[in-house]
Amino acid sequence: LAAFLTPLTAEELSECEDVISDVVREGERLIGMGADEQDRTQSIFEINLSGTGGLDGYLPVFSFSKEEKEFRGVRQMVLFRSGAPYAVLEDAAMQMFLLLNGKARQLTVNTQIEGRVVSFRTQQLQLTHTASTAGGAPHLEVCLTGKLDDVTVDGAPVADKEEAEMTREINAYLNREAEMLNQATFARGNDTFHYAWWLKLYDTAACEALLRTGTLYDIATVDFSSELKPV
């Protein structure tokens, strides 16, 4: 079973019958055939029944061209809470979401940073989680390490003298993306990245008590740090 969203109505989707085979292939890839790929490790959707009877999780959005009736793959992802969609992720945010969820191994980004068009790829990414108690409250440090490759600015390769500054800007950009994702997930009580598991490894009793009272996500803090370096 593969689950996905599309902005098309049922009638509009039926008019794209010539590309249904492409949709089926993409659905198969999303439910596990991506395991052989270098960039994805598992299916990129997750839905669970919430305590209120609605669905929690996230679903990919299959994009189509209404005019040419072409299938354009997955370009967005929607987050759900209690059956209601509340956030739409795309581009770098969607890739970061999959990375933090353990469902992607690398990033391939084309975005705007400080008014310039910046593109880059990553290699050898690794996430480390370090739990502690900061000011008496559970705290988690999430650190991303790895290599930056093929960095361009406005279509041109980065000069050696600009490499260090560009690396700092890219790391700062990824930190902002991760903070936005944290506000859209953990800070709302949606622990899609399983941060509570890491916190419980440090202090099981305290975290279990906070989970029982429903206050863990209000009290615990998460800091993300990107420390990528040039190849």
Residue spans for each PLM region:
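A glycine-rich, acidic short-motif signal
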Residues: 1-231
